Amino acid sequence: TALVRLRAAHANAPPVRVFYQVWQQPLMTVNRRQIIGDILDVCGGRNVFADLAPLVPTVSTEAVVAADPEAIVTASEQGGGAAWRRDPDASAFALWRRQPRMVAVRCDWLYTLDGDLISRQGPRIVDGAAAVCAVLDEVRRERAAR
C-alpha cells in the first residue's frame, strides 16, 4: 500500500522533531496512538508529545518551547488548497513567532497542511501522509544544507 511505501522510503531518514498543533486555544496536539501521530512516525518524524496519555492532549506553551521542535505543523480549517505549504505568517503560528529561539521559528519550518487530507479520516489520509512526508523531507534537506 501507499503507507507501506512511505514508511519504507523514510525508514532510515534522519528523524525530525515535530510539534503537531491541532488547536490554538486551548493548545492541543496528538500522541503517537492518534492517526496523525502514526503518520508522523511513518514519515520519520519524532512527535515531541508522543508519550502523553490522551489521544489529543492539551499542552502548555512552555512545554512546546522546552521541547524545541524542529518543525511545527498544523492543518487548515478550510480544505481544498495545496496539500501543504510553508506558512510562517499564518495566524496559527502567531504564538510561536514570539519564540524566536525555537528551531522551528528560527528556520521558518512552520507548515500548514490541507485539513481535508489530514484531519478527516478516510482514503485521502494517504495523501495527507504524503504531504507530511514532503514537509519533513524539506526540513531534512534544509537542515543538511546548514
Label every PLM stretch briefly.
Residues 2-126, 134-145:
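Binding-cleft/active-site segments that stabilize strongly anionic ligands or cofactors
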